[in-house]
Amino acid sequence: MRHRKSGKQLNRNSSHRQAMFANMMVSLFHHERIVTTLPKAKELRRFAEPMITLAKEATVAKRRLAFSRLRDRQAVVKLFDDLGPHYLARPGGYLRIVKYGFRAGDNAPLAIVELVDRQTAAAE
């Protein structure tokens, strides 16, 4: 029975899912914008938004917790030095998910996941 199980399975086992979302978060924090399938994008929000909330208070313990989830030093540095202070006044809703059409090979629905008020938007 499915009682009290949250989150989508996405046809992956738990370790694959955990690694996939960690990699997606690293890419999102590094590039501030990624393209993925719509179900993955909606599920990624459950993991990425609490990480940005975690980065608002830059303590050593929170950095270690973020590193244990991301396993990427550069992503943790950018998260705590750039993104955390940037979103200090915002109480949540750090990500924007925009539908992006369908993938050519299998017609899967695509979505753009980007940080709201991202810093590199002015450069584009």
From Swiss-Prot:
Transmembrane regions: none
Ribosomal protein among keywords: yes
Keyword match Flavoprotein: no
CC terms in the record's Gene Ontology section: cytosolic large ribosomal subunit
HAMAP family documented for this protein: Ribosomal_bL17 (MF_01368)
Description of how the protein assembles with itself and partners: Part of the 50S ribosomal subunit. Contacts protein L32.
Disulphide-bonded residues: none
Superkingdom as given in the UniProt entry: Bacteria
Signal sequence annotation: none
A GO term for molecular function: structural constituent of ribosome
Keyword field: Ribonucleoprotein, Ribosomal protein
Family: Belongs to the bacterial ribosomal protein bL17 family.
Family matches, as PANTHER family: LARGE RIBOSOMAL SUBUNIT PROTEIN BL17M, RIBOSOMAL PROTEIN L17
Biological processes annotated in GO: translation
Name of the molecule in the record: Large ribosomal subunit protein bL17
InterPro entries (alphabetical): Ribosomal_bL17, Ribosomal_bL17_CS, Ribosomal_bL17_sf
